[in-house]
């Protein structure tokens, strides 16, 4: 069973936004502060723990279960490894592409962990979830009442904001039945114009906060090449301090809200206001015309 005092958080975000990197660097900083943490990777890529373990990809619960015949045939020690600063690491894994539902695998893995005592002596459990759109499968940690506190990693790019709004819509769907709340937007900067201001504006419309603006810094890539978090690779770096600042904000966060997702027209108007998207009315005469059109 799960200790009621454990805070169960989840990081969602568009594919390629830097969600797994941001979450691992933040959780490493939280572990430095004495928080007892378990990461449950819910992405079929199984890359949610690699910086903690200095590994390419951790063997997943579903992969081992398929080898053995059933998840009941596994031992906890086979699927739960210990990484940087004692962080417990598990990857749920996913089915073969085009076969089955990843969400079913996620909940199978979580139930196995709960039944085998993995949730004892922890302060935080963090679910790292694929989430361009919160489909039924990847919403499983929310639907099943596991993840209670959601952080959306986004940026000032159109598709990242579009995904953030969709994820907010998924949270709203289960907010009243399951008690899940939005903890905030994390802006993982892509250096777009007026990016912090734009995400602050989006956060306000979604009835949440931009909990932190993470600046872009090549030291993140240098650390990733070594399969390390920034906090381990360059603990005194400015970027390491940014992740520590975000970690503190999450630990102390009491602004957990029911989101108010916006309509596509409002999102487009916001993007036009900040110059991310061109106003159709300005270019009505060229919309839909090929390059060779006169």
UniProtKB/Swiss-Prot annotation:
GO terms for molecular function: 4 iron, 4 sulfur cluster binding; ATP binding; metal ion binding; nitrogenase activity. It catalyses: N2 + 8 reduced [2Fe-2S]-[ferredoxin] + 16 ATP + 16 H2O = H2 + 8 oxidized [2Fe-2S]-[ferredoxin] + 2 NH4(+) + 16 ADP + 16 phosphate + 6 H(+). ATP binds at residues 13-20. It is an enzyme of class 1 (oxidoreductase). One of its GO terms (biological process) is nitrogen fixation. Keywords: 4Fe-4S, ADP-ribosylation, ATP-binding, Iron, Iron-sulfur, Metal-binding, Nitrogen fixation, Nucleotide-binding, Oxidoreductase. Binds 1 [4Fe-4S] cluster per dimer. The keyword Transferase does not apply. The reversible ADP-ribosylation of Arg-104 inactivates the nitrogenase reductase and regulates nitrogenase activity. The modification ADP-ribosylarginine is found at residue 104. Its cofactor is [4Fe-4S] cluster. Its EC number is 1.18.6.1. [4Fe-4S] cluster binds at residues 101, 135. Belongs to the NifH/BchL/ChlL family. The key enzymatic reactions in nitrogen fixation are catalyzed by the nitrogenase complex, which has 2 components: the iron protein and the molybdenum-iron protein. Homodimer. This is Nitrogenase iron protein. The gene is nifH.
